[in-house]
Design a protein with these regions (language model features):
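Generic hydrophobic/packing signal
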Residues: 60, 74-76, 97, 101
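Short, compact, well-ordered microdomains
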Residues: 66-95
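Anionic N-terminal interaction surfaces
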Residues: 1-31, 85-87, 92, 99-104
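Phosphoinositide-binding peripheral membrane targeting modules
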Residues: 17-23, 31-71, 78
């Protein structure tokens, strides 16, 4: 597995939880996977905040109606959608994750 630097990469994003409801926060790339830190009332509540590399089946980045989007699909067939992502930051986060997944 490719080693991720100890410095965490941060991407502002909003996690889609129910229909058109979003939880705003930040995605972090860490050594063990991708982590989501929610802001506001739902910070540290019952939303998924950790996506370990061995749980991620696929990750993709692309254009959506809400600038750009990151989708993380787990082996349990759940898709986690993060909208309002910056193009440059989103690509910078997804690329090393894909590299780690291809080497696993």
């Amino acid at each position: 597995m490719n080693k991720i630097k100890n410095e965490s990469l941060q991407v502002l994003a909003s996690m889609l939880i129910i229909n058109a409801n979003y939880v705003h926060g930040t995605l972090y790339l860490k050594e063990d996977g991708v982590h989501f830190k929610a802001n506001g009332l739902l910070a540290d509540k019952e939303i998924r905040s950790q996506f370990l590399f061995n749980e991620i089946q696929h990750i993709k980045f692309g254009f959506s109606f809400k600038p750009y989007r990151i989708v993380i699909k787990t082996f349990s067939d759940e898709a986690y959608i993060f909208d309002f992502v910056s193009k440059q930051e989103g690509k910078a986060l997804v690329q090393p994750v894909k590299q780690n997944l291809s080497r696993a």
